[in-house]
Amino acid sequence: ITSLGAREEVNQATHRWGGIVFHDVINQKFAHKAIEKGADGLILVAAGAGGHAGVISPFAFVAETRRWFDGPIALSGAIANGRAIRAARLLGADFAYIGSAFIATKEANAVERYKEMITTSGAEDIVYSNLFTGVHGNYLKPSIAASGMDPDNLPQSDASKMSFGTDDSGERVRPKAWKEIWGSGQGIGSLDEVVPAAELIARFKKEYDEAVDPPL
């Protein structure tokens, strides 16, 4: 899985040992570029995805991509229950790409406060900002507030530079993304507690099956 720049040499090296490459993309420009440079599949990071994310509706994103690409597609963006997984498949994606829901599992190595924050927050607790890395992403408002910043009044970062909380000299200039500012998608309103991953997957399967064949 690659992101933030498709690289031919990485794709070629992966193919040499029999691997396949999926590349994160947020729009058609990057999707075309990824395939041109040798990626095998695409991860469509749609509106509502956690961490670095785009703003395109999953309905539009999958439909437009399927007009020219018949390879494997994973769809990302606010997928946190089995019904959403089924919806992704109906849209034309081959896989649902899920992140935030698995942060709130017992096996995840995230700190407990992060897990708890995911299970007590909802879509309105997510803020979309490029301040923390130079690339727009979705973050938990409570984690921003806990770092002493106003999540509703964040300045814009220089979009031409990637930054992870330090200046050119390495000096810390703001709280660091991922370590103190926690990424999350908008689908977390479906999550109420930290559970074992197996329990989460079993719930996904039950919800998916019910969406395919609703109980009478």
Please place each PLM-identified region on the residue numbering.
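Alpha/beta enzyme core
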Residues: 1-74, 82-100
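Conserved active-site-proximal phosphate/metal-binding subdomains
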Residues: 58-74, 80-216
